[in-house]
Amino acid sequence: MTQEPLIAIVGPTAVGKTALGIELAKTFGAEIISGDSMQVYRTMDIGTAKATVEEMAGIPHHLIDILEPGDTWTVSMFQEKALLAIASIRSRGKWPLLVGGTGLYVQALTHELSFGDAPSDSSFREEMELYASRFGNAALHGKLAKADPNAAEAIHANNVRRVIRALEVIHLTGKPFSEQENGLARPRFDNVLIGLEMERQALYERINRRVDAMMEAGLLEEVHRLYQRGIQGQAIQAIGYKELYAYFDGKCTYDEAIEALKTNSRRYAKRQLTWFKNRSDAVWFHLEEPEAKAKIFDYVHAFLAGKGFA
C-alpha cells in the first residue's frame, strides 16, 4: 500500500454522491474519477445521471464519455484507466476523488485484486464451457446473476472466461465471487471511503422522483435513438435502458416499463448499500441529519491535512 490518499464517495443510487463530490472537489482541489460502470458511454447521459457541464463547475471529470455505446467496458479496463488518471491528477498537484456506485469497480481501484491463491476445478470449468456452448453466453451469465448480482454487474456476458471463473470460485467456496475479490486483496492506497445513506423510504421516494425527472428530461428519446441505431450489448443492459428497450420491442406497455425502471432502481440501491455495508470499511454519514455535510467536510479536511493537502 502506498501512503498516497484516495477518497471515495460511495452509497446507493440517487443518494447525492455526484453533487457532494463536486462540492468537495471545489473546496479541496480534487479531480473526480467516475466509478460508475455506465457513465463511460457517450450519448447515454440522462439515464446514467451524468453531471452536466454546468454542474461540473469546471472540475475535471475522468472516465466519462470515453466509449461508444456498442463498446465493451470491464473491471480490468476501468482499473487500468483509473490508475492512469490518478497518476495524471497527482502530476498536477491535485488529489483524486473517486465517486462511484459500482461496488467491484470501487474495490478494483482501492484494492489490489488477486486470485492467485483461489482454488480451481477443471471439471467444473469444462461443464460450464459446455453449458455456454449449448445455451449461449447470456444463459451462463444468468447463472452468475442469480448467484452473485454484484459480480454479474461488473463482468460482461461475453467475457466467458471471467464468468466461468466467478462461478468456479462460488462453486468451490460457497461464497460470492465479489466477496472473494475484496477478501483476498490488499489496499492499494491510503483509502478513505465516505458512505452516504438516508432512511430507506426517503431514498426510494427520491429514486422515484428522479426517474420521473429523467423521463421529463428526455430519457425516452435518448434510449430511442440508441434503439434506432441498433445498439445492443453491455450498455443497454443498464437500468433505464433495458426497460425502455423492452417497451420499444413491444414486450410491455409504457407504464409497465416506467414501473420496472423504478423497481429495478430501488433494488439496485438496496444491493449497493448492502455491498458497501458488508464489504468496505466506509465511514457512514446519514444525509438527513442537519450537520451531516459539515461533518463530511470536517472529516475530509482532517484527513487531507494529515497528508499535506489541506
UniProtKB/Swiss-Prot annotation:
Job of this protein: Catalyzes the transfer of a dimethylallyl group onto the adenine at position 37 in tRNAs that read codons beginning with uridine, leading to the formation of N6-(dimethylallyl)adenosine (i(6)A).
Protein name: tRNA dimethylallyltransferase
Top enzyme class: transferase
Record note on quaternary structure: Monomer.
Keyword vocabulary terms for this entry: ATP-binding, Magnesium, Nucleotide-binding, Transferase, tRNA processing
Requisite cofactors: Mg(2+)
EC number: 2.5.1.75
PANTHER family: TRNA DIMETHYLALLYLTRANSFERASE (PTHR11088:SF60)
Reactions the enzyme catalyzes: adenosine(37) in tRNA + dimethylallyl diphosphate = N(6)-dimethylallyladenosine(37) in tRNA + diphosphate
Listed GO MF terms: ATP binding; tRNA dimethylallyltransferase activity
Sequence segments annotated as region (Interaction with substrate tRNA): 36-39
Species name: Shouchella clausii (strain KSM-K16) (Alkalihalobacillus clausii)
